[in-house]
Every structure is written in C-alpha cells, then in structure tokens.
Amino acid sequence: YCHINAAGDVEPCVFIHYSGANIREKSFLECLRQPLFLEYRKGQPFNDNLLRPCPMLENPECLPEMVKRAGAHSTDLEAPESAEHLCDKCHAYAACWKPEAEKLWAEEGHEV
C-alpha cells in the first residue's frame, strides 16, 4: 500500500505525510525501495497484535524513529509537521485502544 500526493511524493499511507521519493523524479519501483518504505518492512509487525498495525496511530513511538532513520521529510502540503509532533497527538488514543485490542486479540485465541 502507498499513497502518491498531488506533488508526486510517494508516502506509505494517505494519513502519513512523509517521504523520501517523488514519482516525478524516480520510477515507481525506485520509490517503493525508498528508505522509509524499507523501514516499514523492517519494523512490521510493529507489535504482536495485528489489531494494532499502524506505526502512527497504535504505535506512535515507531514512526518518528523510522522517519529519522530514513531521512524522510514532511510532505504535508497544507501544514507540514515533524513526525514527533504528529505522533504526540496519537499517544492517548494508542493507550486507550491497546487494552481493548489485546482483549479482542485474546478472545480470538491469540497470545497477548
């Protein structure tokens, strides 16, 4: 999965506006091989509960480090912000969702 914004930046998700590659400058395959996407592959799964898959919403401690290691930059065309600032807004949600997700995951017979 990926998202290409109006400026041609290839992002890992429509909600995660960070990239290190632009479709107008590189082939699609090169864009998929950008360091940020490689960081995604290295990090997945971001925890043992697949009901919490996102490195921003459910694992907000992950995305800022991934963006930093990849040397990616903000591609938000309206309001650029650091990955740290974005993810700071997600910690409360992640903390509330984690126990519910773990309960549901356990009910399906998975280890928590």
Q: Residue locations for each model-derived region?
A:
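Short, acidic, Ser/Thr-enriched surface-loop or helix-capping motifs
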Residues: 4-5
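Flexible mid-to-C-terminal extensions adjoining Fe-S/redox cofactors in radical SAM and related proteins
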Residues: 15-112
